[in-house]
């Protein structure tokens, strides 16, 4: 069998179907435990062709289709059904019938922005939504619906391959909208094929690899590395729902142990969740020695999480060099940089005062004379990616010891944003001021390169600037959550709000449900204020403690700081109890 060259994802799946027809491609684990159904490459190809025939009857090539599916194999078939029809797929989080008022607006915005012609879903989700017809907008009522799991496989015989090539749009990846309105990132077949070759090399996928994923399929991490990469590499993938993982994170680790999984991924909170929500008794039966690549990306990677996860799970076979901190974004298809094979995750200890001035000063971890920040390396850029650190205002390259905006150049970069010419030009066609070099894609993220490795410090739009000093919200949020055991990890936001002509620091933080009846507000607020002052030399103007599960988040779980800011100003945060005034040692008034 000669080495294959693929122009499109259709070519890729048809190759697998022809040469590895009976090999298991995907299996679904009900409740994250029991394998209830699976698809071979041949079966997936047949289902995709059947769905494509139905699509080709109802819509024209290059029209858009919204995919609303629970996590599972039917989504994968629908995605490839769209590709096989030459229709642009739009993976999206299905609306929750119980919380339609909260989950529908984002979907309606996507539907309107993409001008989708059809919605694909399965029978169970279709039935749920039809029961909620009165709450659906006119946009949802007017559009065509296709229930894909009711399409007979026999239709596959009528499929005609669409006239597409490597530059054809495969799907729109709507960004999570952590700092803005979601935008549709346009990804071509060439973007995806090219990028999968990078990932295969960077994360060491081989023909004997085995994958599992629970990361949502509508998120770039779950879609590209979780689902498409196993197909590209020709390896089996075990799929479970995010809810199954979140309710009992041990299920993820048990799946890795049971099926001898080599590759799986998750954002930092997933590794933290495993630390907090698994017991010694549950961990006792794990064997994680097969896990070669545990990638950690999609949100800031915390040094404390990395070290604690390794220390906790090393006795059960987890290897220190298996944890791969990574950096990426949908606009780059997925991955920009990650740790090298065989090396430990690198952590730099930086002088906090210098970092506030966008300077990089490395100090000893044992340094007691000054406040320090720990920053985890996300490794060198993958493949042939070119990364530049640029002053976002002058558009000139930063000095090696300076923090700047991360710019990226590579064929994996997306075509642009759907129907947003100005934003596409600004983001994807940037050139360096002094040399004209480019075009680069502007990430909007801040960081620096040291010894060829990329370190991330924050988002430009989230940086808190008070009295001329830069403060990264994630650093303050970590300080806050560690200040009292009642505060939920990764469920807080540090914000800057202008009050009486001056930028002030606001802290919004969720409280654990178990503390609802016993919480001493004065103690918690006092701890928060003291910790932030000690660690960051900042005065907290206002603390708002809110109910568990109420902080604004994106569909992929990222804190929406901009939405928190709006809700704070509107007074619409779901507070733990009525706002009261607490006086700090310094005499400043704080809300709680």
Curated annotation (Swiss-Prot):
Record InterPro entries: AMP-bd_C, AMP-bd_C_sf, AMP-binding_CS, AMP-dep_synth/lig_dom, ANL_N_sf, FAAL/FAAC
Which residues lie in coiled coils?
A: none
Any single GO CC term annotated in Swiss-Prot or TrEMBL for this entry: plasma membrane
Q: Does the keyword ATP-binding apply?
A: yes
Q: Which keywords describe this protein according to UniProt?
A: ATP-binding, Fatty acid metabolism, Ligase, Lipid metabolism, Nucleotide-binding
| Enzyme Commission numbers on file | 6.2.1.47
Q: What class of enzyme is it?
A: ligase
Q: Which Pfam families match?
A: AMP-binding, AMP-dom_DIP2-like
**Per the record, what are the reactions this protein catalyses?**
a medium-chain fatty acid + holo-[ACP] + ATP = a medium-chain fatty acyl-[ACP] + AMP + diphosphate; a medium-chain fatty acid + ATP + H(+) = a medium-chain fatty acyl-AMP + diphosphate; a medium-chain fatty acyl-AMP + holo-[ACP] = a medium-chain fatty acyl-[ACP] + AMP + H(+)
Q: Which Gene Ontology BP terms does the record give?
A: Actinobacterium-type cell wall biogenesis; fatty acid biosynthetic process
Can you tell which superkingdom this protein's organism belongs to?
A: Bacteria
Task: Give the induction annotation.
Answer: Part of the jamaicamide (jam) biosynthetic gene cluster, encoding enzymes catalyzing most or all of jamaicamide biosynthesis.
GO molecular function term, any single one? ATP binding
**Which PANTHER family is this protein grouped with?**
DISCO-INTERACTING PROTEIN 2 (PTHR22754:SF32), DISCO-INTERACTING PROTEIN 2 DIP2 -RELATED (PTHR22754)
- Role noted for this protein: Ligase involved in the biosynthesis of jamaicamides, which show sodium channel blocking activity and fish toxicity. Initiates jamaicamide biosynthesis by the activation of the starter unit, 5-hexenoic acid, followed by the loading of the activated 5-hexenoic acid onto the acyl carrier protein JamC. In vitro, can also use 5-hexynoic acid, heptanoic acid, butanoic acid, hexanoic acid and benzoic acid.
What family is reported? Belongs to the ATP-dependent AMP-binding enzyme family.
Q: What is this protein identified as?
A: Medium-chain-fatty-acid--[acyl-carrier-protein] ligase JamA
Native organism? Moorena producens (strain JHB)
Gene for this chain: jamA
């Amino acid at each position: 069998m000669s080495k294959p060259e693929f122009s499109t994802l259709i070519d890729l799946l048809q190759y697998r179907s022809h040469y590895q027809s009976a090999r298991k491609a995907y299996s679904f684990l009900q409740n994250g435990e029991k394998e209830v159904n699976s698809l071979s490459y041949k079966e997936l190809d047949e289902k995709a062709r059947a769905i494509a025939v139905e699509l080709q009857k109802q819509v024209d090539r290059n029209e858009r289709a919204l995919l609303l599916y629970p996590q599972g194999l039917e989504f994968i078939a629908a995605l490839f059904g769209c590709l096989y029809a030459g229709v642009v797929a739009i993976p999206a989080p299905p609306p929750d019938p119980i919380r339609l008022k909260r989950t529908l607006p984002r979907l309606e915005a996507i539907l309107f922005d993409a001008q989708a012609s059809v919605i694909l879903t399965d029978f169970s989700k279709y039935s749920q939504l039809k029961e909620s017809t009165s709450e659906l907008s006119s946009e949802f009522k007017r559009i065509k619906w296709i229930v894909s799991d009711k399409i007979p496989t026999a239709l596959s015989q009528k499929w005609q391959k669409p006239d597409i090539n490597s530059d054809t749009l495969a799907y729109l990846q709507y960004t999570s909208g952590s700092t803005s309105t979601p935008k549709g990132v346009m990804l071509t077949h060439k973007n995806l094929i090219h990028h999968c070759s990078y990932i295969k090399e960077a994360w060491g996928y081989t023909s004997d690899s085995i994958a599992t994923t629970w990361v949502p399929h509508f998120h770039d991490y779950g879609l590209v590395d979780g689902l498409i990469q196993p197909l590209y590499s020709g390896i089996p993938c075990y799929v479970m729902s995010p809810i199954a993982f979140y309710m009992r994170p041990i299920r993820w680790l048990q799946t890795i142990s049971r099926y001898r999984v080599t590759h799986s991924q998750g954002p930092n909170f997933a590794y933290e969740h495993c630390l907090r929500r698994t017991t010694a008794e549950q961990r006792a039966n794990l064997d994680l020695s097969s896990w070669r690549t545990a990638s950690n990306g999609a949100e800031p990677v915390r040094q404390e999480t990395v070290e604690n996860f390794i220390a906790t799970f090393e006795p059960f076979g987890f290897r220190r060099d298996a944890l791969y901190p990574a950096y990426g974004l949908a606009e780059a298809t997925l991955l920009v940089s990650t740790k090298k094979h065989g090396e430990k995750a690198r952590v730099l200890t930086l002088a906090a005062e210098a970092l506030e001035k966008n300077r990089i000063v490395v100090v000893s971890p044992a340094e007691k004379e000054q406040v320090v920040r720990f920053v985890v390396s996300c490794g060198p850029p993958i493949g042939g990616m070119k990364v530049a650190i640029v002053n976002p205002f002058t558009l000139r390259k930063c000095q090696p010891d300076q923090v700047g905006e991360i710019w990226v150049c590579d064929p994996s970069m997306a075509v642009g944003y759907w129907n947003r010419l100005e934003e596409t030009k600004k983001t994807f066609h940037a050139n360096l001021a002094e040399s004209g070099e480019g075009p680069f894609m502007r990430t909007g993220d801040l960081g620096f390169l040291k010894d060829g490795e990329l370190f991330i410090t924050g988002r430009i739009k989230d940086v808190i600037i008070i009295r001329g000093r830069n403060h990264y919200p994630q650093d303050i949020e970590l300080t806050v959550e560690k200040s009292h055991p009642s505060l939920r990890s990764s469920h807080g936001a540090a914000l800057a709000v202008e009050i009486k002509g001056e930028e002030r620091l606001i802290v919004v933080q969720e409280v654990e449900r178990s503390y609802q009846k016993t919480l001493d507000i004065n103690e918690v607020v006092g701890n928060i204020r003291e910790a932030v002052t000690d660690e960051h030399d900042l005065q907290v103007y206002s603390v708002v403690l809110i109910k568990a599960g109420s902080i604004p988040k994106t569909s992929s779980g990222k804190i929406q700081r901009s939405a928190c800011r709006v809700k704070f100003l509107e007074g619409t945060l779901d507070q733990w109890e009525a706002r009261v005034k607490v006086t700090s040692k310094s005499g400043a008034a704080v809300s709680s």
